[in-house]
UniProtKB/Swiss-Prot annotation:
One of its GO terms (cellular component) is cytosol. Transmembrane segments: none annotated. It holds the Pfam family SmpB. It comes from the Bacteria. Keywords: Cytoplasm, RNA-binding. This is SsrA-binding protein. GO terms for molecular function: RNA binding. The gene is smpB. PANTHER family: SSRA-BINDING PROTEIN (PTHR30308:SF2), TMRNA-BINDING COMPONENT OF TRANS-TRANSLATION TAGGING COMPLEX (PTHR30308). Disulfide bonds: none annotated. It is found in: Cytoplasm. It comes from Sorangium cellulosum (strain So ce56) (Polyangium cellulosum (strain So ce56)).
Length: 162
């Protein structure tokens, strides 16, 4: 797979590469994220990890769990590196996420963390877990795609592998 680039006007901080492998990703939502000053500084330094992150809905509010933002040593009032963080979404989006989680057995997973117009945003996707045979099929598709790209590259350069 080609490396994902940041979209125009966005600065990519982190992305969850495992989410696409472990889940079938569905609808995506862009959410603001409530942060402390030290968390924003560490995000600007690129010190964040989205692996194993997920969202829960509690009393009409969405919280992001499992995101690791490194602690800042020089911060007077630091933050909890893996604490729950509140997400800012419209009410209809929250209701849709809540229904999908409760009725359809889906999971809300964080896929990308980025700055947009100076504000920290997180992209969450409604996801359904893949079975192990689905994961094996994904690996086969990726290998086939990688081989096709190699043939095209070597064929164009004249190595005689075409």
């Amino acid at each position: 797979m080609p490396k994902e680039k940041a979209r125009p006007g966005e600065t990519l901080i982190a992305r969850n590469k495992r989410a696409g492998f472990n889940y079938d990703l569905g609808d995506r939502f862009e959410a603001g994220i409530v942060l402390k000053g030290s968390e924003v500084k560490m995000l600007r330094a690129g010190k964040a990890d989205l692996t194993d992150s997920f969202c829960t809905v509690l009393r009409g509010e969405v919280f992001l769990h499992g995101v690791s933002i490194a602690a800042m040593a020089s911060a007077a009032f630091g933050h909890v590196p893996k604490g729950a963080r509140k997400l800012l979404l419209h009410r209809r989006e929250i209701e849709r996420i809540d229904l999908s989680i409760a009725r359809e057995g889906m999971t809300a997973v964080a896929t990308r963390l980025y700055f947009k117009s100076g504000l920290a945003k997180v992209e969450i996707a409604l996801a359904r877990g893949k079975k192990s045979h689905d994961k094996r099929e994904t690996i086969k598709e990726q290998d086939a795609e990688r081989e096709m790209r190699a043939v095209v590259v070597h064929g164009q350069r004249g190595y005689g592998r075409a």
